[in-house]
Amino acid sequence: MSQGNLYILSAPSGAGKSSLISALLASDSSTQKMVSVSHTTRAPRPGEVEGVHYYFVSKEEFESLIEQDLFLEYAKVFGGNYYGTSLPAIEENLAKGIDVFLDIDWQGAQQIRKKVPSVKSIFILPPSLPELERRLIGRGQDSEEVIAERMSKAMSEISHYDEYDYVIVNDDFEKTLKDLQSILQSERLTKDYQQKQNAMLIQQLLAK
């Protein structure tokens, strides 16, 4: 059975990451793909489904999982809630040949690289700061103050782009989607990947 690849996908708010992930999962059925579902201690919001949006657990359960070293990465955010990525769930899906995407920020990415050096990371850039602000305003969800905060945070996040393996400018949605698909395909053609997937064939070809 093929081994799946683990990917980190990061971007500032408004860069189009969520839409790109949804489109990527719906495309190219030749490879299985999924977004990792995180654990959190915060209460479910209206419309959120257990196991689809998050795994909702108590603070005590979460801290027990931390003690057992069962998180690939985790963080305690403003307000006191925990968020984390389950290591056993990731390993199980990768073993099934599923490419797993982690929708996390640069801080989570740094944690994961220490535990899984083979992870591939992708950063999505906006075409410009004015365009990023226009997209945030166009959502119609946030006040001017919140948008200003998001823009400030975006500039901080963008400063970490050079820590990533791949960088894509999302100035054309369809082109960016194709770029993402190309990354997935190319990662399955690397020497390291093929040595694992076709070990027996390579051994036979090299046998005297």
Curated annotation (Swiss-Prot):
GO terms for molecular function: ATP binding; guanylate kinase activity. Keywords: ATP-binding, Cytoplasm, Kinase, Nucleotide-binding, Transferase. It is an enzyme of class 2 (transferase). The keyword Membrane does not apply. Its EC number is 2.7.4.8. Its main location: cytoplasm. Residues 4-185 form the Guanylate kinase-like domain. ATP binds at residues 11-18. The keyword Cytoplasm applies. Pfam families: Guanylate_kin. Essential for recycling GMP and indirectly, cGMP. Belongs to the guanylate kinase family. PANTHER family: GUANYLATE KINASE, GUANYLATE KINASE-RELATED. This is Guanylate kinase. It comes from Haemophilus influenzae (strain ATCC 51907 / DSM 11121 / KW20 / Rd).
